[in-house]
Amino acid sequence: ADGSDPASSEFLAEGGGVR
């Protein structure tokens, strides 16, 4: 997953970040 969004940072750990 990409870390484009600041809030996605926590999503990255779960593998659900913004692409």
UniProtKB/Swiss-Prot annotation:
GO terms for cellular component: extracellular region. It is found in: Secreted. Conversion of fibrinogen to fibrin is triggered by thrombin, which cleaves fibrinopeptides A and B from alpha and beta chains, and thus exposes the N-terminal polymerization sites responsible for the formation of the soft clot. The soft clot is converted into the hard clot by factor XIIIA which catalyzes the epsilon-(gamma-glutamyl)lysine cross-linking between gamma chains (stronger) and between alpha chains (weaker) of different monomers. It comes from the Eukaryota. GO terms for biological process: adaptive immune response; blood coagulation; innate immune response. Keywords: Adaptive immunity, Blood coagulation, Coiled coil, Disulfide bond, Hemostasis, Immunity, Innate immunity, Secreted. Cleaved by the protease thrombin to yield monomers which, together with fibrinogen beta (FGB) and fibrinogen gamma (FGG), polymerize to form an insoluble fibrin matrix. Fibrin has a major function in hemostasis as one of the primary components of blood clots. In addition, functions during the early stages of wound repair to stabilize the lesion and guide cell migration during re-epithelialization. Was originally thought to be essential for platelet aggregation, based on in vitro studies using anticoagulated blood. Heterohexamer; disulfide linked. Contains 2 sets of 3 non-identical chains (alpha, beta and gamma). The 2 heterotrimers are in head to head conformation with the N-termini in a small central domain. A long coiled coil structure formed by 3 polypeptide chains connects the central nodule to the C-terminal domains (distal nodules). The long C-terminal ends of the alpha chains fold back, contributing a fourth strand to the coiled coil structure. This is Fibrinogen alpha chain.
